[in-house]
Amino acid sequence: MVAVLTWALALLSAFATAQTQKGFWDYFSQSSGDKSKVARVQQQKLTWETTSLKDSLEQDLSNMDKFLEKLGPLSGQGREPPGLAHDPEGMRQQLQDELAEVRARLEPYMAEAHQQVGWNLEGLRRQLKPYTVELMEQVARRVQELQEQLRVVGEGTKAQLLGGVDEARGLLQELQTRVVQHTGRVRELFHPYAQRLVTGIGRHVQELHRSVAPHAAASSARLSRCVQTLSRKLTLKAEALHARIQQNLDQLREELSAFAGAGAGGAEEGANPDPQMLSQEVRQRLQAFRHDTFLQIADFTRAIDQETEEVQLQLAPPPPGHSAFAPEFLQADSSEARSKLQARLEDLWEDINDSLHDGGLSHLEEP
């Protein structure tokens, strides 16, 4: 059954490649197992309206779905389907042979399109990398500044902490004020970097749209949707990253303020705060903020990689022989695989319809 599903996916990819390969209809005519039917379909395409062509293709897809149902669940289990040939092994071998021929003919075209789209998406990742690198550098720089501005170890501060209750309480209250002041300042400083990241995503994704259009197997409408979806997803993730950095700063402010407040309360009760302990606590909280924020930026970078890889599969699927060829179909359960296959078939129709409107019907008129 996996062979049948793979055969269907190979034909699906073949139609997607047809938008950029003018000779596809000739190939389909030569390699189809039912040449007389293809000849009739080609003759009808010369006179049918596009809506009639869609009805015909949808009927063919419906027939294929019924054929898949007759063969049983994708797991390969189930009773022998009625009404089919008495030689299922022969049928399976025939499908495998046809699939091998499809692979051999389509591999170069699909591999080239997949590679070209991949290069353009890799270019997008390279263009966005400076934004995340700059953000990490800013985090490190601001942490260093906060560490200097919130220092409580020095000859003057040490004497203050050990000089008496009023002196110690005054120093710790001043520390609370500095925590609020400087974390608020850092909070504001991150806004321009977040805005530059969002703006950069929008600009570079639009550049990607223009550069990938000549190589994508998808229709222009589907290409636009994919690019817009990518831009929206990355923008939302960038905004979420900025919100998490702000939350990290708020948490840092609250923790340091609470710690300084607790120290001031202890000083009122006669306990002399340890300057070294205070300094170490501030440093540990700042390093925790730096570590957590770096992890969140790294997660955002991985999300860029994942989203662009998904777009590459949508716009230019790898050839059938590629290890990444439809793994979600082969690993999914029956209902999920059928749902994903149906979505692929709907994308297929849109690509074919777009190609025909752009002059694809003229291919059928060639002798």
UniProtKB/Swiss-Prot annotation:
Q: Does the keyword Coiled coil apply?
A: yes
Concerning PTM, the database record says:
Phosphorylated by FAM20C in the extracellular medium.
Localization of this protein = Secreted; Early endosome; Late endosome; Golgi apparatus, trans-Golgi network
Which residues does the record list as Phosphoserine (modified residue)? 56
Q: Which GO terms describe its molecular function?
A: cholesterol transfer activity; phosphatidylcholine-sterol O-acyltransferase activator activity; phospholipid binding
What GO biological process terms are annotated to this protein in UniProt? acylglycerol homeostasis; cholesterol efflux; cholesterol metabolic process; lipoprotein metabolic process; phospholipid efflux
Q: Tell me yes or no: is Signal among this UniProt entry's keywords.
A: yes
Fetch the Pfam families from UniProt. Answer: Apolipoprotein
- Signal peptide residues are 1-20
List the InterPro entries: ApoA_E, Apolipoprotein_A1/A4/E
GO CC, any one term? early endosome
Q: Mind listing the UniProt keywords for this protein, alphabetically?
A: Chylomicron, Coiled coil, Endosome, Golgi apparatus, HDL, Lipid transport, Phosphoprotein, Secreted, Signal, Transport, VLDL
**What does the record give as the function of this protein?**
Minor apolipoprotein mainly associated with HDL and to a lesser extent with VLDL. May also be associated with chylomicrons. Important determinant of plasma triglyceride (TG) levels by both being a potent stimulator of apo-CII lipoprotein lipase (LPL) TG hydrolysis and an inhibitor of the hepatic VLDL-TG production rate (without affecting the VLDL-apoB production rate). Activates poorly lecithin:cholesterol acyltransferase (LCAT) and does not enhance efflux of cholesterol from macrophages. Binds heparin.
Q: How does it assemble?
A: Interacts with GPIHBP1. Interacts with SORL1; this interaction leads to APOA5 internalization and sorting either to lysosomes and degradation, or to the trans-Golgi network.
For this chain, the family text in UniProt reads: Belongs to the apolipoprotein A1/A4/E family.
By what name is this protein known?
Apolipoprotein A-V
Task: State the organism of origin.
Answer: Phoca vitulina (Harbor seal)
Species classification: Eukaryota, Metazoa, Chordata, Craniata, Vertebrata
Q: Which gene does this sequence derive from? A: APOA5
